[in-house]
Amino acid sequence: MMKTLGLRILGEKNVGRLDYLLNRKSKDSWGPLNGQKIRQGVYADILKRIGFKAIVETGTYRGTTSDYFAASGLPVYTVELHPRMYGYSMQRFSKDSRVHVYQGDSPVFLRKLAADPNMPKSKVFFYLDAHVQDSSRYFKAPLVEELEIIFSAWSEAVVMVDDFEVPEMGYGFDNWGDERNLSVSCLRPLKNLKLSAFFPSVEAKLDTGARRGWIVLCREESVVKTLAGIQNLRSYVLQ
């Protein structure tokens, strides 16, 4: 009861700021990119081969992956829907000019970036992890809308999606049944975009960390050729 009262008095955003200042750590943190060494290696290789101008992340949580992205030296734009997690990350990066933290709905955030004349509109790396705000119940993932915005507004974009089903490789993914899971079937409405897809070529048992599935998406042929040469990535034909 006292905890609930405190939340009401302070507000969730301020409680999140206190979480950071009092060093209240999350018990379920695996590290950046879910602590998965294979995925981290693929990201590093992509970063080396493509001259990105910025990184955009949806689903900040406590900023572990945001901080990892910032080590690239590129500006990082990240959005978090949950007020408490936003407060935590806002406080964490309050003195870090590399990381720009926003609160709100990810498609709205992406539309604002798309309309911002100061935001690069080519060669941006996107990391999408805003699909679940409460693991105890189903929320419709904003993924399709996010991808429509990204590939309509940015050229030579590379998108990595977290928690995605990797066929027959043993990775975990967001699965709510009845075609509500994150899988290639949910990408069918985007057929007109003619996206190219890549999955990890390494089985989950050989990776580290949370062993969650992921997919990399792109559009331009030049980017497809670059990704095709990256170790531990395999091309997948979207139907």
Put a short name on every predicted segment.
Residues M1-F125, H131-Q239:
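A short alpha-helical cap/connector motif
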